[in-house]
Structure formats: C-alpha cells, structure tokens
Amino acid sequence: MAGGVAAAGLALGATILLWWAIDETHFPRTDAAFDQLTDTLSAIPGVTLDGSERWVESPTFSDARAWIGATVDESALDAVREAACLSPYPDDVDWALRVSTDGGNAVTLSIGEEGTGPCPLVGLDAAPLFDRLDDVVTGLALYANVQADGRLSLLAEEDPADGVGGLLPLVAHAEDLRDAAGMDSTTAVEVGAPSLGVVVAAGEQERLSAMLSALVDEHGVTRYFADGGPQIDGVDKVQVVAPAEEHRAVEARVRDSGLPVADLPVRFLPSD
C-alpha cells in the first residue's frame, strides 16, 4: 500500500512538473528599483506609461523578466532613454515604445537585447528615421525594428485608407529610410502590411516601386506578397489579388520587371 501511495505521489509530482514546464503563467516579482524606473518614466512630459510588468515563470521561478510599454512624444524619446540608462535597476528590460512623430506617424520600437540592462538600445538612428519617414508618409502606424538577419523592418499595423497604394511611398523610399536609420547600404528593407509584403534589396527600390505602381494603377492589384517568408508548400512565389481579366497582364509585368521575383510562380488569391 505504501509503495502504491509513493508511486502515486511520484506520478502526481511528475504531472505537476510537466504542467509547470509548459505553463507560461506570469508570477509577479516586485522590485523597488524597477518601480522607481516606471515612476520616473511616468513623470516625464510627453510620456504615457501603457503598462509594466516584472515576473518569473515556472518551473524555475528564477531569472525575472521585465517589460515596459509606453507611448512617447518624439521630443521625449531622449529623456526616456536617459532615465532608463541611468536607472539603478540592473537587469534587462523588454521595451515597447510607441513614438508619436512630429509629422503625425506612430512608430512602435520593440526593444530587448540580452545584456543591455534597462537601456533601450534601438539598433538604429531613430530621430533621423522619424524625420525621413515624416517626409514620405503621414498618419501611418508602423512597427520599425532590426530583424535577426539584419534587415530593417517597417510593418504597418493597418492598411491606409487608399489601400496598398498608400504604402508604395515606403517602397519608393526604402533605401532612403534605411540610410536615415544609419544602416549599411547593403541592408535590405522589409515593407509589410495586411495588403503588402515585399523585401527591397539594395539597388532595387526604383524598379520595385515602378512595378508595384503599375500593378496598382494600371491593373487593379489590391494585394501583393513576395517577401520571401515561409510558404506552406515550401515554394517561393508571388501572391496577388487582382481582377480576373488582369491576371495575364499582371504576370507579364512581374516577368518583365528584371527583379528576382521575375522567375517565381505567380499565384492569384481570391478577392475579399
């Protein structure tokens, strides 16, 4: 009987450990220095603290993680960076900073690099990027980040009112935005939105912009995706939404573009 109880106890313990291993529940861990940091940020003019958290996860319940989200006027970004970097809080912080630019855009910077402590190191020159972005578009909400492969990623949260056409200035000025961000001239730029997904390689912005403009203005294309992302069938392709009577002309435009996508199969998606 005792052996059975022991076995049952071991089984229960193993089940609990397994549950802990897959459970992602956050267990709060308060810290005075972290609270001081969030209080300091909240007091900066032009900063609205959207949320903050410091927690541990099962099964180790160690190595606390921290996150801070804030909406920041562009003019207050340097003050946020200074307050964070001078904070006595010693550990890494994951940041989500939504910056309201002077030109009416909203750019979210997701920042979190191991070993940087609380300092929000963006990986790009934010202020010049915002200035150039404001010259190109207005009223867009974007995520701007440096991806693991080094590319600059500019992803719109929603399509603008005029659809994919309103995103084409980002493609036409992709290399200008990259340069403003202080990145190497060989760096590719990913431009994405619900209706668009492209990667602008170095030297391609003019040809890609011209092709996309023709597809939208002359052939009624409302969605275009060729960003090199994972495909369900493992086959790279160009995916397009366009009127049926324009399919042949759309494919011809892609074939004649001289871009790397010219050799990819073109697949037409159903209209919304």
Predicted features and spans:
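N-terminal export and membrane-targeting signals
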Residues: M1-A11
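C-terminal region of N-terminal signal peptides and the immediate post-cleavage residues
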Residues: L12-T40
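N-terminal Sec/ER secretory leader and immediately downstream segment
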Residues: L37-V99
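Short amphipathic alpha-helices in soluble, non-transmembrane regions
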Residues: T40, D78-P88, L167-R178, M211-L215, ...
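Short secondary-structure junctions
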Residues: S42-D50, Y89-D92, L133-G139, V216-R223
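Short edge beta-strands and adjacent turn/loop segments
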Residues: I44-W67, A141-L154, T222-Q239
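Non-cytosolic head/periplasmic domains of membrane-anchored proteins
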Residues: D94-P169
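Extracytoplasmic/luminal low-complexity segments enriched in Pro/Gly and acidic/polar residues
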Residues: A180-D272
